[in-house]
Every structure is written in structure tokens, then in C-alpha cells.
């Protein structure tokens, strides 16, 4: 195996990406049991339940993410229902499109939705969040959208996922502590708000933390079939590690290219259909959730039993989103008969008081709707996530 300035070029990823951080956001396996046009689920259905809607891509190129969120919400509604407060869920497909997401939102309002755990993607979440302050006012907590634009100026919109700046800052601080002598290439999707947002905050914190970035390479969705040109430039610049806040599909391409070029090879990356998992050996990820962590065993086993797949971080974040709604409902003293506006106002106040001991950590929220929790670093070893 050839070397780069005496070392292999190693990727560091986040939850949805290759090298370093979170967007998880994750979720590549196709999850069973989801209808492409949505459907009712949960422990109860009908008028005698508190109705939780969810929105995400259930068809199209990003369907795996939406299906993970849908199933995380569904399982959460089952697990956090009580006799006094049963929860029901309904999913609608937005194909990761903002206009379709707003249409899906209105469909869920017609169904009687009292709170929204969604949408899944950032663009769709920004579009729907702008509607949540209208009449009826609607409480929204997105499992996986990470842009600050989602919650900015919204008093009833919250996030489960780290914001983009937090992901980039935390990743740079961690890498500066653990890998201060490495030379980094920053590799990201310049056409994606999630990827470029994390890259910007990572770069700023890297400068402050004296982390050396020797090269910066970008791509867009229509060119995500081969990254050999970018990797060649990174090698020539003397890079020894890659920081890549990108989604799983381009991450799998990147790792194949890294391996092909004689270098050493994300959360969710092991579930990409047809992906050679040996390529991810030694991969470093920063993520608040691992299906291999013993503390998550009950959730993982229940998810596998119901859907036949291992849950990823999208599913875990969605499950934690329902958990947060359930805790906030108790804190606010709300029941199944709460109207959306009443629920939005009281749940939003309750969110600032609760602490959720969730799958993705101990979660609290600030008055901007942003979550506070700690990421954990994992290394892929023998096809499993091992805490670094």
C-alpha cells in the first residue's frame, strides 16, 4: 500500500458522511414496510390518539433517509405511548423537495396532526418551518435537518441533530486534540447546504485550533461518480487525513477511490447496498449514535425485529424526536384533545425545561430550538463501531 508523505490518507467522517462529524446526519439500507404514499402507524390510530406527523423522501434517490426517519417515528410512537396518552403517526413523502414538503405538511394538517417530527432533509425543513407559525400554529422538531436556518426566528421549531456550525466546530476541536500532527484535506459537496455549512465552520475552527488544512476539494451531485482527481491533488498537497462532511452514497465512492489509489480507507456507510465494508476499516466517525453500543441494544433489537434492518442515526434521531415530544407533552400537561396551536405553544415552552435521556445522548434545548448534546468518536473495526 503506497503512502502519502510517509502516512496513509485516512478518511474521518461524520454521521452522514465520510470523515468527521454528524448529518447523519445516516441511513442507507432500504427499510421494509413503508408505503411510498405514507400511512398511519403507531400504537393507536384515530381520534383517541395524539397525532404525530412525519415528512421525508420515501421515494427517489434519498428514500433511504426518509424511510429510516419514518420507521424511527413509528417505533417511537409505539414505545412512548401510554394508556393515558396514546400516540399515532402518519408519514408523507416529499422526495426531499421543499414545495412537496409543504404540500405534505398541509396533508398532515388535514389528517389532524398535532405535532410534526420532521421533515428529514434540510431544504424541506426550512420550507416547512416557515409554515409552522401560520394558523394553525404547529410544533415541529426535525430529526435530521442541521442548518441554523431551520430554527432561526421560529419559536415552535426544534432540532434533534447538531447544527452545522456545531458539527464542524466539534469535529475540528476533537481532531486537533487527537490528530494534531496530521495534514488535512477538506472534502465537501459545494452544492449542498449541509456539507458546505459544516465545511465552513470546520475551516474556521481548524484555524483557531491550529489544525493544518493543506488542501480543499469540492464536488457536486452531478459529478459524484469518481473523486480520483480530487484525491490526486490531495496527495500532491501532502494530505494525510480527509475530513469529509458528506452523505453516505458519495462517501462510498470516496472510500472506493481511496482504496484504489493505495490509501487506507461512515455511520450508515456499512449499510450501503453492494458496498465492500472492508474498505471502511479504520474509518473514524464522530456520531452520537452507534448500533453496536450496548446501551442501545433494546432499541436496535426491537428495530431489527420489526423492520429486518439495523437502525442508523436517522432512525435513532427520529426515535429521540418522538421521545422529546412525549416528555414535553407530560411536562405541558397536554392530552389527545390538544389543538395544534395550543400544542405548539405549550410544547415549545416545555422543551426548554425537559432533559431527554435518548439514544443519541442526553438532550436539552436552548431558546433557539437547538439541541445540546455531546458527540462520540468511533473507529470502524472488523465491521463494527468501536469507541475511539
Residue ranges and their predicted role:
Residues 1-13, 21-32:
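N-terminal secretory signal peptides
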Residues 34-45:
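Bacterial lipoprotein signal-peptidase II cleavage site
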Residues 40, 67-69, 79-151, 219-221:
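Beta-alpha junction/loop-to-helix N-cap segments that form part of ligand/metal-binding clefts
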Residues 53-72, 76, 80, 92-99, ...:
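Extracytoplasmic "Venus flytrap"
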Residues 58, 157-218, 241:
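An alpha-beta-alpha
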Residues 101, 160-183, 196-198, 224-228, ...:
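Hydrophobic alpha-helical segments within soluble ligand-binding/sensing domains
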Residues 255-319:
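Extracellular/periplasmic periplasmic-binding protein-like sensory domains
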Residues 311-315, 327-384:
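Segments of small-molecule ligand-sensing domains
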Amino acid at each position: 500500500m503506497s503512502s502519502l508523505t510517509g502516512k496513509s490518507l485516512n478518511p474521518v467522517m461524520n454521521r452522514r458522511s465520510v470523515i468527521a462529524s454528524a448529518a447523519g446526519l445516516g441511513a442507507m439500507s432500504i427499510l421494509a414496510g413503508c408505503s411510498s404514499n405514507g400511512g398511519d402507524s403507531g400504537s393507536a390510530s384515530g381520534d383517541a390518539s395524539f397525532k404525530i406527523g412525519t415528512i421525508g423522501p420515501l421515494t427517489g434517490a434519498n428514500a433511504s433517509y426518509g424511510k429510516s426517519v419514518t420507521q424511527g417515528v413509528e417505533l417511537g410512537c409505539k414505545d412512548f405511548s401510554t394508556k393515558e396518552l396514546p400516540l399515532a403517526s402518519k408519514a408523507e413523502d416529499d422526495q426531499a423537495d421543499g414545495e412537496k414538503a409543504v404540500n405534505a405538511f398541509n396533508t398532515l394538517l388535514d389528517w389532524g396532526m398535532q405535532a410534526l417530527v420532521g421533515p428529514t432533509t434540510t431544504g424541506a425543513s426550512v420550507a416547512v418551518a416557515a409554515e409552522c407559525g401560520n394558523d394553525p400554529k404547529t410544533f415541529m422538531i426535525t430529526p435530521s435537518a442541521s442548518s441554523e436556518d431551520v430554527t432561526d426566528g421560529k419559536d415552535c421549531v426544534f432540532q434533534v441533530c447538531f447544527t452545522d456550525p456545531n458539527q464542524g466546530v466539534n469535529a475540528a476541536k476533537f481532531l486537533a486534540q487527537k490528530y494534531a500532527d496530521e495534514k488535512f484535506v477538506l472534502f465537501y459537496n459545494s452544492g449542498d447546504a449541509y456539507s458546505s455549512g459544516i465545511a465552513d465552520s470546520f475551516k474556521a475552527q481548524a484555524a483557531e485550533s491550529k489544525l493544518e488544512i493543506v488542501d480543499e476539494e469540492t464536488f457536486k451531485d452531478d459529478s459524484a461518480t469518481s473523486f480520483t482527481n480530487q484525491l490526486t491533488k490531495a496527495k500532491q498537497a501532502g494530505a494525510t487525513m480527509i475530513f469529509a462532511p458528506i452523505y453516505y452514497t458519495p462517501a462510498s465512492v470516496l472510500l472506493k477511490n481511496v482504496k484504489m489509489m493505495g490509501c487506507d480507507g461512515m455511520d450508515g456507510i456499512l449499510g450501503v447496498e453492494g458496498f465492500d465494508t472492508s474498505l471502511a476499516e479504520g474509518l473514524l466517525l464522530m456520531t452520537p449514535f452507534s448500533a453496536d453500543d450496548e446501551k442501545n441494544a433494546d432499541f436496535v433489537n426491537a428495530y431489527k425485529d420489526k423492520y429486518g434492518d439495523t437502525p442508523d442515526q436517522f432512525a435513532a434521531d427520529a426515535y429521540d424526536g418522538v421521545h422529546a415530544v412525549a416528555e414535553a407533552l407530560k411536562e405541558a400537561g397536554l392530552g389527545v384533545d390538544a389543538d395544534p396551536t395550543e400544542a405548539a405553544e405549550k410544547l415549545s415552552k416545555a422543551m426548554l425545561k425537559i432533559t431527554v435521556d435518548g439514544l443519541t445522548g442526553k438532550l436539552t434545548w436552548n431558546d433557539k430550538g437547538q439541541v445540546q448534546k455531546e458527540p462520540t468518536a468511533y473507529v470502524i473495526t472488523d465491521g463494527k463501531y468501536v469507541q475511539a
